[in-house]
């Protein structure tokens, strides 16, 4: 037992070497001494490590409404998708927290299975950004994977376990934190079977990849090579439990509207058809994309087992011109605000008039790139301006017009001794 002892000879701390005269207390043990300063330092180290461990715990999970409110600050439109995602994510992390707390209901009641998510929507509708925003709101590690780079074991390409490696890297190789992260797999529609007919040849990047993903989607102990690449027997692995990792898959699923149209059309053929048109394709209350069901994904080429591990399905609408204009100006990190900040650092103001914003949105629609293409259009418009402004101390304000966007005309400049008209 350690105690504060009086000794006849000089006593020094066994850790820092300070004498009894240099510190307030020295605690003695069998053949060892420690001073009060070293005790305080040890306590700080232990408290710091304990606090780092505590950060892995999910304490205050935001409610679905709080998640949507946060998403609304960054994501324009897609209200139905935001509500669906907020409920799904809330239930997922509520389940994770219950399992971590060893809740009695978890032990005695029904097992809470995880619900991964499918996002269906055109290019540039915000699928990736929604997934990224959810991870930021929940403060969990996040990784993006491209399904087209994956192949099944034995073929040239990436193993599916490399998806987990990206998540682990983004969690600073903290396995426990990575096991509560979110993985978004993009271009999932590109690994659909090419046809419903069974082929003699192997579908290396299609059904085989879907089969390879099944285990990690459902929950398994995966062996992840720390350096990535292909696995081999002599290699060391990091084991990751995917049970509590939320998987969100997304794809444009080009042509799925035709599948929905055929399905809805079949329902309106024959006796007993609804004459009021409630089941008709042209029902304005919902777009074709909003009426996608798992059966349509099956027809598209995803296998039943894969669809079954993605029980939550939500669709994103194609963004309209009005949506794109709002995306340019309203979110906290809106592109217009970003470029205004950049120009302000050079001592000038930047203004996009309404016609200019409309022209940018129309160009994005013409390119069929959705919100994803907005930055490149603005960058193309602003390149010469950002080249000249740092050298022009006389410029007070830059006004971007429709002609600046559409025809690469010179912007309107307000000089220091002028006033805007």
UniProtKB/Swiss-Prot annotation:
MF annotations from Gene Ontology: ATP binding; ATP hydrolysis activity; ATP-dependent protein folding chaperone; protein dimerization activity; unfolded protein binding; zinc ion binding
Chain sites annotated for binding ATP: 122-129
One Pfam family this sequence matches: AAA_2
SUPFAM superfamilies: Glucocorticoid receptor-like (DNA-binding domain), P-loop containing nucleoside triphosphate hydrolases
UniProt cross-references to PROSITE patterns, sorted A to Z: CLPX_ZB
Residues that hold Zn(2+) according to the record: 13, 16, 35, 38
GO cellular component term of the entry, any: HslUV protease complex
Domain ClpX-type ZB span(s) in chain numbering: 1-54
Keyword terms, alphabetized: ATP-binding, Chaperone, Metal-binding, Nucleotide-binding, Zinc
Lineage top rank: taxon: Bacteria
Single biological process term from Gene Ontology: cell division
HAMAP family for the chain: ClpX
Function summary: ATP-dependent specificity component of the Clp protease. It directs the protease to specific substrates. Can perform chaperone functions in the absence of ClpP.
Summary of subunit composition and partner proteins: Component of the ClpX-ClpP complex. Forms a hexameric ring that, in the presence of ATP, binds to fourteen ClpP subunits assembled into a disk-like structure with a central cavity, resembling the structure of eukaryotic proteasomes.
Family, as annotated: Belongs to the ClpX chaperone family.
Name listed for the protein in its UniProt record: ATP-dependent Clp protease ATP-binding subunit ClpX
Taxonomic lineage from the root: Bacteria, Bacillati, Bacillota, Bacilli, Lactobacillales
Gene: clpX
């Amino acid at each position: 037992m350690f105690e504060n002892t009086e000794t006849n000879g000089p006593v020094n701390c066994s850790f820092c070497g300070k004498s009894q005269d240099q510190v307030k207390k020295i605690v003695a043990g069998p053949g060892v001494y420690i001073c009060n300063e070293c005790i305080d330092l040890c306590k700080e180290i232990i408290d710091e490590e304990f606090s780092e461990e505590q950060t892995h715990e999910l304490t205050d999970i935001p409610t679905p409404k709080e998640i949507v409110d946060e998403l609304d600050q960054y994501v324009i439109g897609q209200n139905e998708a935001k509500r669906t995602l907020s409920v799904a994510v809330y239930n997922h992390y509520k389940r994770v927290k219950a399992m971590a707390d060893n809740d009695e209901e978890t032990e005695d009641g029904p097992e809470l299975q995880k619900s991964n998510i499918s996002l269906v929507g055109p290019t540039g509708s915000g699928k990736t950004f929604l997934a990224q925003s959810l991870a930021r709101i929940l403060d969990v590690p996040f990784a993006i994977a491209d399904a087209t780079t994956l192949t099944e074991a034995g073929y040239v390409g990436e193993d599916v376990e490399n998806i987990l490696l990206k998540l682990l890297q983004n969690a600073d190789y903290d396995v426990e934190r990575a096991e509560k992260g979110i993985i978004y797999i993009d271009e999932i529609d590109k690994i659909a079977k090419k046809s419903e007919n069974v082929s003699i040849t192997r579908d290396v990047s299609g059904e085989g990849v879907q089969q390879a993903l099944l285990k990690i989607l459902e929950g398994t102990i995966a062996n992840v090579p720390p350096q990535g690449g292909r696995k081999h027997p002599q290699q060391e692995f990091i084991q990751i439990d995917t049970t509590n990792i939320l998987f969100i898959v997304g794809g444009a699923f080009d042509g799925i509207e035709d599948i929905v149209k055929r399905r809805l059309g079949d329902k309106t053929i024959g006796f007993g058809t609804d004459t009021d048109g409630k089941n008709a394709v042209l029902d304005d209350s919902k777009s074709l994309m909003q009426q996608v069901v798992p059966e349509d994904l099956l027809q598209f080429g995803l296998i039943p087992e894969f669809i079954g591990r993605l029980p939550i399905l939500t669709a994103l609408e194609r963004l309209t011109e009005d949506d794109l204009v709002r995306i340019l100006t309203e979110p906290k990190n809106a592109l217009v605000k970003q470029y205004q900040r950049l120009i302000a650092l050079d001592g000038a103001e930047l203004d996009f008039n309404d016609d200019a914003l409309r022209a940018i949105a129309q160009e994005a629609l013409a390119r069929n790139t959705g919100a994803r293409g907005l930055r490149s259009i603005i960058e193309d418009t602003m390149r010469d301006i950002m080249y000249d402004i740092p050298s022009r101390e006389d410029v007070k304000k830059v006004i971007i017009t429709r002609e600046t966007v559409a025809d690469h005309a010179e912007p309107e400049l307000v000089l220091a001794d002028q006033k805007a008209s």
